Each structure stands twice: as structure tokens, then as C-alpha cells.
């Protein structure tokens, strides 16, 4: 772990709802700069800024359209550089959220990958070899591009999975992690990291860090190898840069390139607990099965809540 991380107190910022300086109703990087003294006054000396790269924002910025551009709603790259400088002058480190597992379907890499003719980005994403092929257990989309193939998704339809390879090969269209196309994906992500670190960023909180490689082994052998490779680069070129993993497995992540693990227990859908009736919506008590907190038959309906608290 980096020495500065041992004393770090992080303040997480969701940019769009933090502080708006231009009156458009959306928070921005200048708003973060304006509140640095406030943040420091709370005793915090590090920031984790949720996704702020260019995006259509179909998934809160976790669908990146351009890794090297700040989203227009938040400002400019010049604003990012100004934020790094202002924060450092106050002894505050700044980490950006990095989403290496997928891009937006509007990313230029993906647009090129969709073309039927072979090009540099044809295998930057995971494609089957036929528009009628399934995803071998992974979610997929077909029939929407000129290319004869279906593409693998990580989460939503708008988030095609970047190709880091497969740990276990089941289909002829699946590539091993040492395939040149998969190696190129790793190098492209290193290039993104260098871009922001050169500007003054202090590191990254890495989204879905444990699941880059598909069909990986139980101990994430191939994904771990990628992160050790990236850490080797950072140790040489940016020795003070921090990596924080969304992994939920510190015994694994800390041995494979990460300084800290973003460790959270995964919970259920909070909205469903409040509003939707389904088995187990409230808890395991037999009297509560199929009753959500704010539904009329729960004894804690919304009317009672409104009458007593508003």
C-alpha cells in the first residue's frame, strides 16, 4: 500500500448531484473545486469521483463513450487538470472511477468493431462468429450491426464487453488471454490510465475489476495476471498511483496489483423491499413473506408513513 493511502480519508463524489456552478442543474468539476476547502474541513484528504468521462449516461456514466474526455455536463479536460492542481495544493489526492470491462455502444472502438471488414478494433470486443449464435451463457445482442455476429454484454444492452479473452475456451470464437487482440485491449487501458495520470490524477477506483476475463478460473488466474501486468507498469512509471478494486475479495485483489479493496457486501434491491411484493420482500418472518414495507397489506403502508412523518 502507498504510504499516502495509509492516512487517506476518502470523500466520494457523484458529480452530477454534488455542486453546480453554471446553473444548468447538474454538478460539475468546477463545483468540486469550489468545495475543496469544505471537503478538507471535514478531515478528508482524498477524493473518489464517480464516472465523469464522456458518456450518453444510460448507466450513470458506467457506459463510457470516450475514455480521454470529460463529459460535457461536468466540464472539460482543462477543468480536470485544474481540479488536480487545486486539490494537490490543499493536500488532497484525486481518484477517478475507471470502467475497464465495457464501453458504451457509442464508443468509436465499438463502432469500428461493428463493421464487417476486418480492422484494428474487430476483436476489441467479444463477438461470436454468426448472427445466429448465442453467447455461450453470456448475455448477447444480435442482428443490430452490419457484422455477422452477436456481441457479448456485461450488463445493459448499451454496454458491450471489452475483449480480455477467456480463461476456458468453449467456442472457436473465444480467444485466449494472450491473443494479440486481448493483449491490445490491456494496452489500450494502460494508455487511458497514463493519459489521466500524466494530467495529475492520483489513481483509480476500478469498476468490476475481478471479472475482466470470461470463463476465468475460480481463483481468477487470468484476470489476476492482467492486473499484475498493469501494476508492473504503474510501479515503474507512476509509483505513487493507487488502484482500488471493486472486487470484494481483498485476499485476492491485494496480491494482484491493488492497494485496497472496495469491499462491500452485496445487498438486494432496496426499492423492491419498499415497494414491490414478492417472496421474502421484507424478511424471513412467515407473516411478512410477500409484503413490502410501503404496501397496504404490510401494516406499514405509505399512508401511515405520510400521516405520521409529514
Where on the chain are the PLM-derived regions?
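Active-site neighborhood of glycoside hydrolase catalytic domains
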Residues: 166-251
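A generic short-segment signal for beta-strand/edge and adjacent turn/coil regions
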Residues: 16-17, 38, 63, 93, ...
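Short, function-defining helix-loop hinge/capping sites that tune catalysis or transport
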Residues: 20, 105, 213-215, 254
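N-terminal structural segment of carbohydrate-active enzymes
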Residues: 1-190, 194-195, 202
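Residue-level signal for threonine
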Residues: 77, 220, 263-267
